[in-house]
C-alpha cells in the first residue's frame, strides 16, 4: 500500500537517495530543507519530488516522518513540532535498518571508498537481477520486484548499528570524524561492533592492520594484492583507459576483469565487489561484463573539459582519499602537471590531521588551498587556519579566494583536481567562468 513520506532535511546525500528509492517504489514523497543549492537536489527535482522550506505546515499526522540526523528539537521547527504533538519520526539510519529486512542486503562500510564501491556493486548487481540501492552520492533506485538491496553503511556517530546485512564489505579503517571518534581504537570498536551484525559473509581489505583484528560470527574473507588474502588481484595492468587484472580464490583464477577507473584503490574496490558476488553465487563472466560499463558516481573523480582544460571534481576530504585521487589522476594523465586545489573540511579534522594533509598534498605538482570549510556542528576558535597547512606543504602552495582564482592560470599542460567536502565547487565554477571569459576575449 502506498504511503506518504516527508523527509526533514531531504537534500542530505543519504536522505535524497532514500527519497528517490521510495518514490520509484510508488510512494508519495516530499521533503524540506534549506534554500542553498546542493548537488543532490537535481535528482529530486527531475523526479518531481517537492522540496519545501522548513515549516510546521509541511507536516500532517498521516505522514511517515524521516528526519536527518543533524536536525533536533532545538534547531529545526519541524522536529520541534513533531515532538510537541507526539508525532513519531525515525532517523534515516533507524528507518533504513527496518527497511532492509525485506531484502537480501549487501552493505558497504569503511572510512574511505564507500560510495565508489557501493556504486560499483549496485551497477553490476542491477544488471544481473532486480536490485534496489542507496548510494552516498545522492543516487537511489527502487525496483518494484527487487530481492537484493545494496546500501552504503556510514560509521559516523555509529549510524550503521541498526543494520544487520546478509553481506558486507569493509574497505578500510582509518581515523576520521575527530568531532565524534576519540581515536583509532574508538573507530575500530565501532566497525567491530558492526561486523558482528553481518549474517552471511564479511569481505575486508587484507592489508589493513585494523581489519585483520575484526571478528564476526559470519565467515570473513580478506581481499587484496597479497597471496595471504582469500581473494587476490594479480597480473595488474594500469593504463590511461583503466585497470586490467585477474582475481584468484584458493589458488584458482576466477576471472579476468577490466574496470574503466583509475588508481590502486579502484582495483581494490572492484576486487571486493567480485569477492562478494562470487560468494553470493553469481556468474563471474557476467560480473566481468558489467564491470566494464561502470561510469562512476557523482563527485568521485568526475571529469569535464572546459576549453581544452581538464578539470576533475572529487569529494576527497581526508589525506588517504587525497592520495588515492592524485594517484588516479597520474594514472590517467601521466604526462600532465597535476594541480591540486583543496579545501579542508572542518576545523577539528584539519587540526587532527594537519601533517597528514600536507604529506598527501605533496603528491601533486602544485597546490592551491581554499579557506577551511567549517561544519555546522563546530565553532571556529581560531586554532587553525589554512595558511598553517600551506606552510607545511613541501610543494609550491598558495591560498586562493573564490573571487580570484587567476593564479590557477599559471600552468600549461595541466590537470586541475578540485577536492573537498565543503563548497569547493564554487571555486571550480569560478575557474570555469574564468576560462570561458578568456576564450571570449581571445576570439
From Swiss-Prot:
Record: residues binding ATP: 110-116
Record pathway: Cell wall biogenesis; peptidoglycan biosynthesis
Key word Cytoplasm present: yes
EC number: 6.3.2.8
Keywords for this protein: ATP-binding, Cell cycle, Cell division, Cell shape, Cell wall biogenesis/degradation, Cytoplasm, Ligase, Nucleotide-binding, Peptidoglycan synthesis
The reaction(s) this protein catalyses: UDP-N-acetyl-alpha-D-muramate + L-alanine + ATP = UDP-N-acetyl-alpha-D-muramoyl-L-alanine + ADP + phosphate + H(+)
Localization (cell): Cytoplasm
Spans through the membrane: none
Family annotation (Gene3D superfamilies): Mur ligase, C-terminal domain, Mur-like, catalytic domain, NAD(P)-binding Rossmann-like Domain
Gene Ontology MF, one: UDP-N-acetylmuramate-L-alanine ligase activity
Pfam families, A to Z: Mur_ligase (PF01225), Mur_ligase_C (PF02875), Mur_ligase_M (PF08245)
Highest taxon of the lineage: Bacteria
PANTHER family in the cross-refs: UDP-N-ACETYLMURAMATE--L-ALANINE LIGASE (PTHR43445:SF3), UDP-N-ACETYLMURAMATE--L-ALANINE LIGASE-RELATED (PTHR43445)
Family designation: Belongs to the MurCDEF family.
HAMAP family: MurC (MF_00046)
Record NCBIfam families: murC
Protein name per its UniProtKB record: UDP-N-acetylmuramate--L-alanine ligase
